[in-house]
Amino acid sequence: MIKTKNLKKNYKSLQVLNGLDLNISKSEIVSIVGASGAGKTSLLQILGTLDKPSNKDCELIIDDIEVLGMSEKDLCNFRNTKIGFIFQFHQLLPEFTAIENVCLPAFIKKTNRIDVIKRANELLCYLNLEDKINNKPSELSGGEQQRVAVARALINNPQIIFADEPSGNLDTTSAENLYKLFFDIRDKYNTTFIIVTHNQKLADLADRKIEIIDGDIN
């Protein structure tokens, strides 16, 4: 599903990633851990095509496609079709309702409006938010807001979801429920998850845990 070879990243003189080789299988849930500044988020952003490696002699293959040579337009279309994102701060638009927030990526993709609304309703019901569909983010708890963000990440049927500290803003119970939800989604949709987290207990629940130390995989 995802393969990297000799992936490097530096910010001026600071080397963040030191030539990483990585293989992630379809439907695998992988956690990425490490100290602050170790390179976790930099790796996640490159894998998610939000950033590019610093070196040219590297590979990033997603779903058998080498993505580093894509034009910006093709890469944007690829990202919107294949990939979903979940962040610590859900980034829901406050002026829109839950279902409107969920629908946005599919509207950008120009999917049929009726089909989008139907799927958004199905996802919100699946995530036990059927009675919150028309609520705005300010009317939802932190855990509910994050579940809306999960539904938004799923709206385009992505093969891969990248999550950057998705439970960092949640209490312990909500965080554990969120991780259980990831496994349920994987089992239902065969989705691959790559999760950056500081929470070692939750990281240990993943199929595989990758530790980044000073830009290298331990």
Residue spans of the language-model regions?
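Helix-to-loop junction immediately C-terminal to a conserved catalytic motif
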Residues: 48
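Conserved ABC transporter NBD signature motif
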Residues: 56-66
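Short coil-to-helix segment of the ABC ATPase nucleotide-binding domain corresponding to the Q-loop/switch region
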Residues: 96-105
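Conserved ABC ATPase signature
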Residues: 136-146
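A short, proline-enriched helix->beta-strand linker immediately N-terminal to the Walker B motif
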Residues: 155-159
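Catalytic Walker B motif of ABC-type/P-loop ATPase nucleotide-binding domains
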Residues: 161-164
